[in-house]
Amino acid sequence: MIKRENANIDGDTAMGTMLKYGSEGAKYFVDNYVLPKDIAAAHINGDIHIHDKDFYMLTETCCQIDLIKLFKNGFSTGHGHLREPQSIISYAALACITIQANQNEMHGGQSIPNFDYAMADGVKKTYAKEYYTWLAASMRLETGIDDDQAAAIVARAKSEITEELRIANMDAYGRALLDLKPEGISEEDLKKAHDFAVAEALNTTEKQTHQAMEALIHNLNTMNSRAGAQVPFSSVNYGTDTSEEARMVIRNLLTATEDGLGGGETPIFPVQIFKV
């Protein structure tokens, strides 16, 4: 018995049955009114195979989606506009929505060719947010400065430091922070606050990234598309972004995949492709 047609279509549901009726009708129409008779006969006899023949005249097949370009300044699904995501959890959630929305517009698979690069941007934003939060908290707790003073130091750091704030560059960022010489806190205390913020930001970002990848795995194996008849046929490509942020994403994606969906069920999607 076929449980899932084409790996992702539940033919036992009402909408799955309706899709099957439409599919068979479309294939009959293509065979009898669109294709040359010899080509239609070759397919029927099994000499050739025309994949997804039911969609032959309707829409494009299989799309690679550039999430970096799509997420910049936000995008519309056709049902509403979504602002640019600002955390790894939002990046993962909107990646699922993107795949789901596109699956409703075309047949075939929906692929993200630069998954590691795209999700690394989300990790970078999350890490920066966590770092500044922990930096302010540490300065308040360890030195006794008030909220306004801590916020002012963080604001100066954001506006005046030109060093890029990312996981592999925190030593240089720390030196630039000390060069600000803010009032109300010693250089020693500021360095301690920085070191503490770096460690805690890395820890909390790792946890949030795992949650994001776990949610992505669960969503892509359960969320409906095409009127509830199937889950999107999704794939992600990764392996060429060697930044710490990208490696954090893929490490947690693999861990979440290994953990499975629960009840001993192995996730079918996304198909994971390692690029070289």
What is each model feature region?
Residues 2-276:
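Conserved catalytic cores of very large enzyme subunits
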